[in-house]
Amino acid sequence: MQITYYRHKKGVLRMHSRDMEYIVGLLKNGKDAEAILSVRRKLNMAFLARTTDLSGKLPVLAFGSTFKKNGDGIQLRRYNGYVLLEVNGLESQSEAEAVRREAAALPQTLLAFVGLSGRSVKIVVPFVLPDGSLPKKEEQARMFHAAAYQLAVRHYQPQLGSIISLKEPFLSRG
Protein backbone atom coordinates (compact mmCIF):
# COMPACT_ATOMS: atom_id res chain seq x y z
CA MET A 1 0.00 0.00 0.00
CA GLN A 2 1.25 3.48 -0.78
CA ILE A 3 0.80 6.87 0.83
CA THR A 4 1.42 10.37 -0.48
CA TYR A 5 4.51 12.23 0.64
CA TYR A 6 4.51 15.90 -0.26
CA ARG A 7 6.24 19.18 0.45
CA HIS A 8 6.39 22.69 -0.92
CA LYS A 9 9.80 23.48 -2.33
CA LYS A 10 10.48 26.97 -3.65
CA GLY A 11 6.73 27.58 -3.86
CA VAL A 12 6.06 24.44 -5.92
CA LEU A 13 4.06 21.49 -4.61
CA ARG A 14 6.01 18.25 -5.00
CA MET A 15 4.10 15.00 -4.50
CA HIS A 16 5.27 11.41 -4.46
CA SER A 17 3.54 8.13 -3.71
CA ARG A 18 5.73 5.88 -1.59
CA ASP A 19 5.48 2.39 -0.12
CA MET A 20 5.01 2.14 3.62
CA GLU A 21 8.46 0.51 3.97
CA TYR A 22 10.04 3.62 2.45
CA ILE A 23 8.12 5.86 4.87
CA VAL A 24 9.14 3.76 7.89
CA GLY A 25 12.77 4.03 6.79
CA LEU A 26 12.37 7.77 6.34
CA LEU A 27 10.95 8.16 9.83
CA LYS A 28 13.71 6.06 11.39
CA ASN A 29 16.80 7.35 9.69
CA GLY A 30 16.03 8.99 6.38
CA LYS A 31 17.49 12.17 5.01
CA ASP A 32 14.86 14.16 6.92
CA ALA A 33 15.79 12.61 10.30
CA GLU A 34 18.42 15.30 10.91
CA ALA A 35 15.95 18.02 9.92
CA ILE A 36 13.37 16.57 12.32
CA LEU A 37 15.87 16.60 15.20
CA SER A 38 16.85 20.17 14.36
CA VAL A 39 13.22 21.34 14.27
CA ARG A 40 12.51 19.55 17.57
CA ARG A 41 15.38 21.43 19.22
CA LYS A 42 14.13 24.73 17.84
CA LEU A 43 10.53 23.96 18.84
CA ASN A 44 11.64 23.48 22.41
CA MET A 45 13.06 27.01 22.36
CA ALA A 46 10.47 28.75 20.15
CA PHE A 47 7.22 30.44 20.97
CA LEU A 48 4.10 28.68 19.65
CA ALA A 49 3.44 31.50 17.21
CA ARG A 50 6.58 30.61 15.29
CA THR A 51 6.21 26.83 15.08
CA THR A 52 4.62 26.94 11.63
CA ASP A 53 7.74 28.66 10.30
CA LEU A 54 9.84 25.76 11.51
CA SER A 55 7.64 22.82 10.54
CA GLY A 56 6.89 24.02 6.99
CA LYS A 57 10.32 22.86 5.83
CA LEU A 58 9.51 19.19 6.36
CA PRO A 59 7.44 16.83 4.19
CA VAL A 60 3.83 15.99 4.99
CA LEU A 61 2.62 12.39 5.01
CA ALA A 62 -0.98 11.81 3.88
CA PHE A 63 -1.72 8.31 5.16
CA GLY A 64 -5.40 7.99 4.16
CA SER A 65 -5.00 7.99 0.38
CA THR A 66 -2.68 8.55 -2.51
CA PHE A 67 -3.10 11.72 -4.53
CA LYS A 68 -1.84 13.15 -7.79
CA LYS A 69 -1.49 16.68 -9.09
CA ASN A 70 -4.29 17.66 -11.44
CA GLY A 71 -3.79 21.03 -13.09
CA ASP A 72 -4.03 23.59 -10.30
CA GLY A 73 -5.12 21.18 -7.56
CA ILE A 74 -4.81 17.62 -6.37
CA GLN A 75 -6.99 14.60 -7.10
CA LEU A 76 -7.63 11.40 -5.17
CA ARG A 77 -5.84 8.54 -6.86
CA ARG A 78 -6.63 5.69 -4.47
CA TYR A 79 -8.04 5.25 -0.98
CA ASN A 80 -5.89 2.90 1.10
CA GLY A 81 -7.83 2.48 4.36
CA TYR A 82 -5.19 3.91 6.71
CA VAL A 83 -6.57 5.93 9.63
CA LEU A 84 -4.28 8.35 11.49
CA LEU A 85 -4.86 8.87 15.22
CA GLU A 86 -3.04 11.53 17.23
CA VAL A 87 -2.24 11.69 20.93
CA ASN A 88 -1.17 15.30 21.53
CA GLY A 89 -0.16 17.42 24.49
CA LEU A 90 2.08 14.88 26.20
CA GLU A 91 4.42 16.20 28.88
CA SER A 92 7.74 15.03 27.46
CA GLN A 93 9.43 13.01 24.76
CA SER A 94 9.86 10.11 27.20
CA GLU A 95 6.09 10.06 27.80
CA ALA A 96 5.55 10.16 24.03
CA GLU A 97 7.94 7.21 23.60
CA ALA A 98 6.03 5.25 26.26
CA VAL A 99 2.68 5.90 24.52
CA ARG A 100 4.27 4.99 21.17
CA ARG A 101 5.47 1.65 22.59
CA GLU A 102 2.00 0.92 24.02
CA ALA A 103 0.35 1.70 20.69
CA ALA A 104 2.91 -0.31 18.72
CA ALA A 105 2.25 -3.34 20.92
CA LEU A 106 -1.44 -3.43 19.96
CA PRO A 107 -2.09 -5.93 17.14
CA GLN A 108 -4.20 -3.47 15.12
CA THR A 109 -1.38 -0.91 14.84
CA LEU A 110 0.40 -0.71 11.52
CA LEU A 111 2.75 2.12 12.53
CA ALA A 112 3.26 4.31 15.60
CA PHE A 113 5.77 7.15 15.80
CA VAL A 114 6.56 10.23 17.86
CA GLY A 115 5.43 13.46 16.20
CA LEU A 116 7.58 16.38 15.17
CA SER A 117 7.26 18.20 18.51
CA GLY A 118 8.46 15.15 20.44
CA ARG A 119 5.33 15.49 22.60
CA SER A 120 2.79 13.72 20.42
CA VAL A 121 2.27 10.26 19.00
CA LYS A 122 0.86 9.39 15.58
CA ILE A 123 -0.76 5.97 15.17
CA VAL A 124 -1.65 4.47 11.79
CA VAL A 125 -4.38 1.81 11.78
CA PRO A 126 -5.44 -0.09 8.63
CA PHE A 127 -9.12 -0.78 7.92
CA VAL A 128 -10.89 -2.80 5.21
CA LEU A 129 -14.47 -3.74 4.39
CA PRO A 130 -15.74 -7.13 5.65
CA ASP A 131 -14.82 -8.74 2.31
CA GLY A 132 -11.23 -7.44 2.59
CA SER A 133 -11.64 -4.77 -0.08
CA LEU A 134 -11.67 -0.97 0.10
CA PRO A 135 -14.23 1.51 -1.21
CA LYS A 136 -13.50 2.59 -4.79
CA LYS A 137 -15.58 5.76 -5.08
CA GLU A 138 -14.49 8.91 -3.27
CA GLU A 139 -17.79 9.52 -1.46
CA GLN A 140 -17.91 5.90 -0.22
CA ALA A 141 -14.30 6.21 0.90
CA ARG A 142 -15.12 9.37 2.88
CA MET A 143 -18.02 7.69 4.69
CA PHE A 144 -16.03 4.52 5.37
CA HIS A 145 -13.04 6.54 6.58
CA ALA A 146 -15.15 8.59 9.01
CA ALA A 147 -16.68 5.41 10.48
CA ALA A 148 -13.26 3.72 10.69
CA TYR A 149 -11.81 6.76 12.44
CA GLN A 150 -14.54 6.73 15.10
CA LEU A 151 -14.06 2.99 15.64
CA ALA A 152 -10.30 3.44 16.01
CA VAL A 153 -10.75 6.24 18.56
CA ARG A 154 -13.20 4.12 20.59
CA HIS A 155 -10.73 1.22 20.59
CA TYR A 156 -7.43 3.02 21.22
CA GLN A 157 -8.45 5.60 23.80
CA PRO A 158 -9.20 3.09 26.60
CA GLN A 159 -6.31 0.83 25.55
CA LEU A 160 -3.74 3.61 25.80
CA GLY A 161 -5.22 5.46 28.73
CA SER A 162 -4.49 8.65 26.78
CA ILE A 163 -6.86 11.06 25.14
CA ILE A 164 -6.93 10.82 21.37
CA SER A 165 -7.06 14.29 19.82
CA LEU A 166 -10.23 14.32 17.74
CA LYS A 167 -9.60 15.59 14.23
CA GLU A 168 -11.76 15.82 11.15
CA PRO A 169 -11.08 12.48 9.38
CA PHE A 170 -10.08 13.84 5.96
CA LEU A 171 -8.79 11.36 3.40
CA SER A 172 -5.78 13.63 2.96
CA ARG A 173 -4.87 13.40 6.64
CA GLY A 174 -5.34 9.73 7.29
Describe every region a protein language model picked out.
Residues 115-130:
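Short, conserved phosphate-binding/catalytic loop or strand-edge motifs used
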Residues 43, 47-51, 103-107, 152-160:
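Hydrophobic, Leu/Ile/Phe/Ala-enriched alpha-helical segments that form helix-helix packing faces
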Residues 73-78, 112-118:
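Short glycine/proline-enriched loop/turn "hinge" motifs that connect secondary-structure elements
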Residues 1-81:
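DNA replication initiation on ssDNA origins
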Residues 3-11, 66, 72-93, 128-174:
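DNA replication initiation modules
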Residues 111-117, 166-171:
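Short beta-strand
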Residues 83-86, 113-114, 122:
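Structural recognition of the beta-strand scaffold that forms the well-ordered cores
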Residues 92-108:
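Short amphipathic alpha-helix segments
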